[in-house]
Amino acid sequence: MMMKRVGLITGIALPLYIMLFSNFGGSEQTSRMAACAVMMSIFWITEAIPLAATALIPLTLFPILGIASSKATAAQYMNSTVFLLIGGFIIALAMQRWNLHKRIALNILAVFGGHPIQLVLGFMLATAMLSMWISNTATTLMMLPIALAIIARYEQFLSEQQAHRFTLGLLLSIAYSASVGGMMTLVGTAPNLVFARFYQLVSDQSVGFAQWMMMALPIGICLLLTLFVVLSLLYLRNLPNSTELRQLVDGEKKELGKFSSAEKAVLLVFLTTATLWITRKGINVGSFNIQGWSSYLPYGEMIDDGSVAVAMATLMFFIPATGRQGEKTTLLDKKVFSELPWPIVLLFGGGFALAFGFTESGLSAYLAEQLQGLKSVSLYVLILSVTTGMNLLTELTSNTATTQLVMPILLSTAKVMEISPVWLMLPATLSASCAFMFPVATPPNAIIFGSGRIKVVEMVKVGVVLNIIAILVISGMSYWLIPYIWVT
């Protein structure tokens, strides 16, 4: 509460001081834009008002301060990237409505035996695979009750110390796998789509789904393996096997009943959507090229992943289904629109409007002039610095809001360095998903901490190690992979 109060006072007083007494590049418009950026930064970091409310500030202040017209500012709040987000959420909600996500998770868990190490590996794979396509929060909320039931059964024949170690290993594996899984696809988590929009703005090209996955998938797999090794060494050694754990998973599967026709239909739509996303733009790695399906259509250049997402989401309102009580319905109905995360949609728009203001006011050009000293810094050191800074920032702030704030600054930095913005924007985006230390860092961390089974100091202890590993892996693999996958 105190943080919010301080944020509210500072978020108003400091921008007023900047407008009245500071001079950014000798331009009043630049100073006004800097004041708006500072206000939004403080409000987003302290959450003095809701994040979505802060995102609406440009619509009010930009026209009043002469930065941009209402019409031009409002246009930033809705674009194809936002529709990709909305379409992806609708498909994810269909999976949740018909319990397809739970069936997928339990089938993955059933493959692994009753040994704690194998079970944790199963939880990590199930969580990561689901969070690639549905929200990290929804995935964690679904996996947590299953994990708690297994913990309750397993701790009956363990010592208190063994039970606590197993609890830590299993619950932390869910939180961290949800975050890492989200980074591996373009729709897995909001910062990825923020990157996609900014990349489109600066390059006039869309980010291909396969292009993203060729970069993020190897990094994500490397991080998951590292997570598994670290958690196994810290918490899962010398724990006994148990056939009861497998029986519990099998029991959960039986409760779901038979694979319904509605689940099959949602699965077919989901697989078709994923295939269309991945193959739309084709695959280009060095001299290796495969044409995407859109290149064979008369107006294929007008289609993007947002078009695919909305088309497939709309299709589910037409496909008939039988409800759990035998009633006739469709895969989705009008209720889904009340379940969409509209605050995140507004948060996206606010970030894009902020970036638009940076360009329109000349603040981006001013920042580029001030960053001339970075020319002497080596590229790898710069990537490492950006990755580290982003990782630390997102430990205490919203990763989506932070990504929105940082992108315009990274664009200015890249301009000074005379390099492609991808070198800085991509590692920053990936590291935004790797805040492992504090409960407030990510929704999965907060949900797992909210179970009451983990102390803050226990999360910090393993989180510090994993943060360092994530920074090194993302920096190193970005430096190595970007030249092969992106035009730099």
Predicted features along the sequence, with ranges:
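Juxtamembrane and boundary regions of transmembrane helices in multi-pass small-molecule transporters
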Residues: 2-21, 97-100, 136, 158-177, ...
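Re-entrant/interfacial helical elements at transmembrane boundaries that shape
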Residues: 57-59, 138-152, 171, 184-201, ...
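C-terminal transmembrane helix pair
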Residues: 156-157, 217, 345-364, 377-488
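Flexible hinge motifs at transmembrane-helix junctions and intramembrane kinks/re-entrant loops
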Residues: 24-29, 39-56, 73, 137, ...
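Hydrophobic core segments of alpha-helical transmembrane domains in multi-pass membrane transport
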Residues: 8-22, 36-46, 59-64, 87-93, ...
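Interfacial loop-to-helix junctions that mark the boundaries of transmembrane helices
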Residues: 2-3, 24-31, 43-44, 71-80, ...
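Membrane-embedded alpha-helical segments and adjacent helix-loop junctions characteristic
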Residues: 21, 39, 52-161, 327-331, ...
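Alpha-helical transmembrane segments
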Residues: 80-90, 132-143, 213-229, 301-312, ...
